């Protein structure tokens, strides 16, 4: 008798996606981050929903409503910190997921990769708007600085900024629209994730060797469900340790001060997961140039498939490319560190060198090294 999961239209869909899905037999733990991102998204939507029940999106009450959630709402403190630190965990998983895609050549699955880039940008926009909602000093000034970048757009810039603000400065209308967008975007992210999976299942998963695996596939369940559950437990352990022992470790102390338009914090900076892009923005002396560099730091991912010159998909057997890859990873860590430092010597110079190295590695060095490796293969 045929199991119900193979007959029922709805269960058949779930079955083909998560149970009987043919999966390469050799995919490593690096492939766990996709399912972890799904878990993060569920956690963020759930905790966010409960926070939205008690939050007040008005400049006069937003800060005190956060204090009310933390102090008076039953288990409000853990919901709040799970949401804040869950965002950090989501970005850790996201960066590792993108990093794995770069290393193993998953970017050659163009539809999946491009929807992934849209997902990354949407998630970054959602997180930025969420950072504004507590209406602390860093929320207010972060919103002012980042939204003000739109004024760099020629001709329509100033009008665009005032349209986003809902007035002549960041105030209640800005907060209300940011809350509205922050609430709706995770559901758009969920829809995009479904598309991401749809295109992934059209081609099938990549694998560490970067070769076709049609002759050697196994079902997703029970093998990879078990493997993913182990990853999920380790992820939850890390999240709970962070939330229960150091809930404010990744936050900014300035955000515990009510937003004040008359006092500027000594050092305005976004959340840690935006610092690499923030450094690139600061490294360009020109405002419009900085905004373009900021956008290109993410959109550069879209040109990586075009710049792929190697005869091999994966970097597994390309030692020179591996060296460049880890140089790029280290460079991103340096950019993140510099973003948290004040705008003074030597941090400005280090930031500029790291920014140039970031673009040079991706646009010039990686394609050249791949061509050299191709020649070395011919000589072998």
UniProtKB/Swiss-Prot annotation:
CDD domains: cytochrome_b_C (cd00290), Cytochrome_b_N (cd00284). It is found in: Mitochondrion inner membrane. SUPFAM superfamilies: a domain/subunit of cytochrome bc1 complex (Ubiquinol-cytochrome c reductase), Transmembrane di-heme cytochromes. GO terms for molecular function: metal ion binding; ubiquinol-cytochrome-c reductase activity. Its cofactor is heme b. Heme b b566 binds at residues 97, 196. One of its GO terms (biological process) is mitochondrial electron transport, ubiquinol to cytochrome c. The chain crosses the membrane at residues 33-53, 77-98, 113-133, 178-198, 226-246, 288-308, 320-340, 347-367. Keywords: Electron transport, Heme, Iron, Membrane, Metal-binding, Mitochondrion, Mitochondrion inner membrane, Respiratory chain, Transmembrane, Transmembrane helix, Transport, Ubiquinone. InterPro entries: Cyt_b/b6_C, Cyt_b/b6_C_sf, Cyt_b/b6_N, Cytb/b6-like_sf, Cytochrome_b, Cytochrome_b_C_euk/bac, Cytochrome_b_N_euk/bac, Di-haem_cyt_TM. One of its GO terms (cellular component) is mitochondrial inner membrane. Its main location: mitochondrion. It is a multi-pass membrane protein. PROSITE patterns: CYTB_CTER, CYTB_NTER. Binds 2 heme b groups non-covalently. A ubiquinone binds at residue 201. The keyword Nucleotide-binding does not apply. Component of the ubiquinol-cytochrome c reductase complex (complex III or cytochrome b-c1 complex) that is part of the mitochondrial respiratory chain. The b-c1 complex mediates electron transfer from ubiquinol to cytochrome c. Contributes to the generation of a proton gradient across the mitochondrial membrane that is then used for ATP synthesis. Belongs to the cytochrome b family. The cytochrome bc1 complex contains 11 subunits: 3 respiratory subunits (MT-CYB, CYC1 and UQCRFS1), 2 core proteins (UQCRC1 and UQCRC2) and 6 low-molecular weight proteins (UQCRH/QCR6, UQCRB/QCR7, UQCRQ/QCR8, UQCR10/QCR9, UQCR11/QCR10 and a cleavage product of UQCRFS1). This cytochrome bc1 complex then forms a dimer. This is Cytochrome b.
């Amino acid at each position: 008798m045929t199991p119900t999961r193979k007959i029922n239209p709805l269960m058949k869909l779930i079955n083909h996606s998560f149970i009987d899905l043919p999966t390469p037999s050799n995919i490593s733990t690096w492939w766990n981050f996709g399912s972890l991102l799904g878990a993060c998204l569920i956690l963020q939507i759930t905790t966010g929903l409960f926070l939205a029940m008690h939050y007040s999106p008005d400049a006069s009450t937003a800060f005190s409503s956060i204090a009310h959630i933390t102090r008076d709402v039953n288990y409000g403190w853990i919901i709040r910190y799970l949401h804040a630190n869950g965002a950090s965990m989501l970005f850790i998983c996201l960066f590792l997921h993108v990093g794995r895609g770069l290393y193993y050549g998953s970017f050659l699955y163009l539809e999946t990769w491009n929807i992934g880039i849209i997902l990354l940008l949407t998630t970054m926009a959602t997180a930025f708007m969420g950072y504004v909602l507590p209406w602390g000093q860093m929320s207010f000034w972060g919103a002012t600085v980042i939204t003000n970048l739109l004024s760099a757009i020629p001709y329509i810039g100033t009008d665009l900024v005032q349209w986003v603000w809902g007035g002549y400065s960041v105030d209640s209308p800005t907060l209300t629209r940011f809350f509205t967008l922050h609430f709706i975007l995770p559901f758009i992210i969920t829809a995009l994730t479904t598309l991401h999976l749809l295109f992934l299942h059209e081609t099938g998963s990549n694998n560490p060797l970067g070769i076709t695996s049609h002759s050697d596939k196994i079902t997703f369940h029970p093998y990879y469900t078990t493997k993913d559950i182990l990853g999920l437990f380790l992820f939850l352990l890390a999240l709970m340790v962070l939330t229960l022992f150091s809930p404010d470790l990744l936050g900014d102390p300035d955000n515990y001060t009510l937003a004040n338009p008359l006092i500027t914090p000594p050092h305005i900076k976004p959340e840690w997961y935006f610092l690499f892009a923030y450094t690139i923005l600061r490294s360009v002396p020109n405002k419009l140039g900085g905004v373009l560099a900021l956008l290109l730091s993410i959109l550069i991912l879209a040109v990586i498939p075009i710049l792929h010159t190697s005869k091999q998909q994966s970097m597994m057997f390309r030692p020179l490319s591996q060296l460049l890859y880890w140089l790029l990873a280290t460079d991103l860590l340096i950019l993140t560190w510099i973003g948290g430092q004040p705008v003074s010597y030597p941090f400005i110079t280090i930031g500029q060198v790291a920014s140039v190295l970031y673009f040079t590695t991706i646009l010039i060095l990686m394609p050249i090294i791949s061509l050299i490796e191709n020649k070395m293969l011919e000589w072998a």
